[in-house]
Amino acid sequence: MRLYLLRHADALPGADDAQRPLSPRGEQECRCLAKFLERAGIEFEAAYTSPLLRARQTAERVLATCRAREDLQAVVTDNLSNETSARAFTDWLGRLSAAKHVLLVGHMPSLAERLCALLEVEPSAAFRLPKAGLAALARDESGTVTLKLFVSPKVLGLK
């Protein structure tokens, strides 16, 4: 199984954090990342997102442009919110279907913490996922997880 941990793209500021939409830059980040994923031949079979608007919009924009099952919609889950414990996230992840390519859209700092936990590295070595940053992980049958790809908007040519 390949897991793609994606931090939501840039969002507009706002008083209601849960309802902050993507900014024009965030829309551009999504297009750029989705085109990269499409060129890489990655076809998502499952997708999950935090309930916050900017994460849902990021998932929608990426899935609309890159290769994915035609009817694939991101499932909204609290397991990708910052309030969910690492243990609850790990338990949830263990119950996911055996899809080959799974997109997970969430937030900092929890995505970096989950990344460290999955890779079995110290949290002090936390990865910094920029907005619209993506970490691709491979999990084999034995449960061993390896980092396969780390992409940021800067790497894709966005300043």
Residue ranges and their predicted role:
Residues 3, 98-106:
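Generic beta-sheet signal
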Residues 40-42, 95-100:
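Glycine-rich phosphate-binding loop signature in dinucleotide/nucleotide-binding domains
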Residues 2-84, 125, 129-132, 159:
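Active-site-proximal alpha-helix that buttresses catalytic centers in soluble enzyme cores
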Residues 119-148, 153-156:
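Domain-level recognition of soluble alpha/beta enzyme cores
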Residues 78-98:
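Short phosphate-binding loop-to-helix
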